[in-house]
From Swiss-Prot:
Main location: membrane
Keyword vocabulary terms for this entry: Cell membrane, Membrane, Transmembrane, Transmembrane helix
Subcellular location, record wording: Cell membrane
Pfam family, one: UPF0182
Family as reported in the entry's similarity comment: Belongs to the UPF0182 family.
Listed transmembrane segments: 21-41, 64-84, 98-118, 134-154, 173-193, 219-239, 268-288, 295-315
Organism: Parasynechococcus marenigrum (strain WH8102)
Origin superkingdom: Bacteria
InterPro entries: UPF0182
GO cellular component, one term: plasma membrane
Protein's name according to its UniProt entry: UPF0182 protein SYNW1212
Bilayer topology term: Multi-pass membrane protein
Amino acid sequence: MQVEWSWFQQFQLEGVLLERWLLQLASAVVALLPIGLAIRWSRSLDPSPETASTVRLEGWRYSLTLLLAIALQLVSLAVINGLILQAIDDSMNLASGWQVSIHQSQLPVLTLISLVAVMQPRLRRLLPWFVSTAVVLIAARAWGVWALAWSIPLSGLQEPFLKADVSFALGRFAALQLLIALLSSGALFCLGNGLQTLLTRPPALSDWSCAVPGPRNRRLLMLMAALVLVLLAGQCWLSRHALLWHQHGIVAGAGWLQQAVTEPFRMLLTVELLLLALAVMLPSSLLLRRRLLGVLAVTLALGFSLTPLSRWLILRPQELSLQTPYLEEAIRSTRHAFQLDRITRGSYKPEPSLTKADIVQGASTLSNLRLWDSAPLLETNRQLQQLRVYYRFPQASVDRYPLSPQGDTPQQVILSARELDQSALPRRSKTWLNRHFVFTHGYGFTVSPVNTRGDDGLPEYFISDLGTDTRIQGNRELGIEREDVERAIPVEDAALYFGMLRSPYAVAPTRVDEFDYPEGDLNVYTHYRGSAGVPIGHWLQRVAAATYLGEPRLLTAGSIDHSSKLLIRREVRDRVQAIAPFLDLRGDPYLISIPQSGQPTSASNQHQYWVVEGFTHSSTYPYSSAVSNSDSDRYLRNSVKAVVDAYNGSVQLFISEPDDPLIRGWARVFPQLFQPLDAMPSSIRDHLRVPKELFDVQVKQLQRYHVEDPRVFYSGDDVWQVPLEVYDGEQISVRPYHITAQVQDRSNSEFLLLQPLTPLARPNLTAWLAARNDGKHYGDLVQIDFPKDTPILGPEQVQALINQDPEISKVFGLWDRGGSQVVQGNLLVVPVGQCLLYVEPVYLRASKGGLPSLTRIVVSDGRTIAMADTLPGAIDRLMQKTLPPVATGS
């Protein structure tokens, strides 16, 4: 606890930790109340033999009753075991809608253990303690479920089926379902365990019969049975809401059948269960109970028979007319749940040929066109820029920096952080001292323009190498000077103590020098001067740290001094997750390097920060369609941008979706944790981008839900798909890519994330979806529709034309036969003026693992194909091929 407290204290967030502890404690204390009542109930049962009773349970009646008691306990234990596993593994996932999460391989083992525990008398005595402890543990671990249910605000949106606010589905439904599950499993266990206790009193098992429980015990059993019935009624009532987010045929949510048949039956069942519970508690009401049980059985039989009959006789013959209002609601809700209702739609009819006017109009697009894919650039970095075996470039991110003083359009670059990979240390260097005291951090990063290459075909660099040998270069072809790069991208003090690679704990500063970076054949050493870490200078702090980590060597390490601190959770996603466990941190973080004036709170000259994308999501949004069979999300928001200092480890959380009810609820619980996006320094905000993880989901949903007419949606005639392309010899789906282009004839180009789309089972281009990233337009979506009466070639078709071109296929064949491997890069489809331009970079590498070099650029306007060493050269050749021949006089 001391280490956790000190860790939160470095962010001045110890109040958040204290509040979480208090929420867990309060949840556990509240859970003790029903447990206390259950204990009192069980102690009230009289286990002594019923001598006065003349009525006995014998034969099959005794067997059936005993089996019922055992079955009740097994069902209860199955629910409890599932909740324990889920609460321990990911307690916040309970907020997505409770479900038993027992793996199939675990189910037989847990069932066998539960059966042995129920049947073995000594173990059975321990079961009440196990169930009580489990309920308290689950309730405490589910503190986030209770907190969100209490604090989530009204959204102002009401679903039309049960007229509940959407916030009920997003935040309160899970809490109610978990509460009913805990109470039901506890009540079932008490009923089954108490009944088994009465049935197995000596000599009942040897005689295989026992006296019927006396009046006092019968009243207690009836009271618990009535409680079980009330809880079943509550679950039945709550299950009506679950109809709103389960797929029923073509409708993502409750359709005509659910409203006309299923929901009324469930409401009727709820009333009947409550009446039966009341009858169970009333004395001398055996006839009433039997009649209610008969009515309940008839209702269930009618429900199971009437539903398929109604579907077959009424719904199927007139499905479209009956389901139209529900389809409209499903389309509207799905589009809102994934922000497709924010899309601005436009149309674009490209001209068949590229003209000089198009080139002038699209100059800013062409001057920033990405020719380097991340994969070949990373491959080059790993061979030329890792510099030591223990350095690693885990990923490369596309970004933009204001490098050109002449233009308003930032230069698009690819930035890759050089992190320390401790698993790559030589075996003799993997000592405890080296791993935790010496090799503590990575250093530096590379920055490359996306649109140029060197004379050897390899990437050019604005920033390369590291330490005092760091090379900062301008680019004459782009008109960028060295001073422009130095001004926009600081490189000094580029030690990366926190990154995206998983790293062990580090102790710094100590009496041992830390490896900083290599300089020629020598090494440069340093001592950590940042503000991160848990102090371990005092012997009591060292004892706490050694206990926390299970590392006794911290107690005897002579290199630790009074200023030493323990650096833990150095993977930036782990760092954010520890502070905000309710956020989903899907996707890779990306590094930015910004000038001093724009940094958040920092105690050093550090300029490097990681941006981590935080998502809120739910699988219980009314009438919204799930993303896929493997992804149950029905609601998704990129609600938080987390900024982590790469040197000091500070974490700041900025709310990027202030209208999201989920993040508003969490901001009510932890107001000191969040800041508005306006509070983010502008120099960091200039590097924000729509995460591909969100954009991919939006593209997935748009493929069906771009259709807003329920009749067209029902017919399924207008479904889109992501086109295919061949990359490095494999056919893959076209991934969304960043381009700098003009939006809807605007004069200035913007940094866009673009995804082309084609009709299902057809390769023609039908639309684009673009996410805007700059300024006040951040997060806006633009859908560009292409004319349906004019076929526009899709990426797969253009790539086929490229491979069929005699000149190009001849060159590719010569390279392949010459011992080299041709790698066709990502095919980009970009708007240039009034024309579409298809651009494919071609890389060449040795068959035995050589460096990929950018060798050719292939361009096409959809009719003509040209290839050259450079993009301007390829465009010139394309225009020469498309220009009409000049008429000559006689």
